[in-house]
Amino acid sequence: EMEATMRRYNALRLYGIAAEFLDRAALARRVPDMNLGRDARWPILGALSQPRGGVARHDAVAWGFARGADNRGVDIIQNCEVTGFQRGADGRVTGVLTTRGPIASDKVGVAVAGHSGHVMGLAGMRLPIESHLLQAFVSEPVKPFLDVVVSTGALHFYISQTDKGEVLLGGGLDGYNSYGQRGTMPNIHEVTAAAIEMFPNISRLKWMRQWAGVMDMTMDGSPIIGKTPIPGLFFDGGWCYGGFKATPASGWCFAHTIATGEPHPLNAAFTLDRFGRSAVIDEKGAGPYPKAH
């Protein structure tokens, strides 16, 4: 893992991205509550730090985009479920059916993250996507002790502290297909054990709440942005668990694709038909296993 960390560090520096390598002494000064004992199950040798990296509150970002869209004349309809698509005689999509009535449109863009398979199924399409659950949970609030996000590949979890003092934890996928946003106890146990090993000072905290999000995992770990075989229907999804940070760029490329009818050069390779052409974009090299990405 240290070799992979150094390789990532060098790659970041080559691209002009601020990064620092922290040895044990520097890490102890930066994160004093971390267990750096030699007797740990996975002794910590060092860390990679991105000082300019940060955390954005998901809800606040959504509110900001919604307010900006509303100011520009976009009609945002809440609590309105899509139940199907209207189709013309030639098969072209001509609108959306919802619980509040039909909405006519010459072009329809689908961007529904974890429910991509379900919504596109309403149009008769089966996607090369699996839906998996990704859990997170928060503790009771405590005084500030952690002002960075810490993640580890060996223990396979991440930890941070919210502005309200809650300790936020998350780990890997639950490993089975589901739309139930509940998660499982084994995952909670594994992540909690790993967190206590790295930060023993949280061992007596109580969990306040837990939830799971539905992840749209593609067969190669890369997103799909572009046209579909159905005229007038466009799709943006398959972002696995990295979609939030890609929101501005993916939205811009998706808007360009819908407006012009052709993909932007930035998303031209991320087509739906790449899986049939053996043109997959498997950056991780994990193979055709959605849960491995």
Where is each model-derived feature located?
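Dinucleotide-binding Rossmann-like beta1-alpha1 core, especially the glycine-rich loop
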Residues: 1-33, 156, 186, 194-196
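Helix-loop-beta segment of a Rossmann-like dinucleotide-binding subdomain
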Residues: 8-9, 19-21, 28-72, 172-178, ...
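C-terminal catalytic lobe of FAD-dependent flavoproteins
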Residues: 19, 154, 196-293
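Short loop/edge segments at beta-strand edges and connector loops
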Residues: 23, 78-80, 209
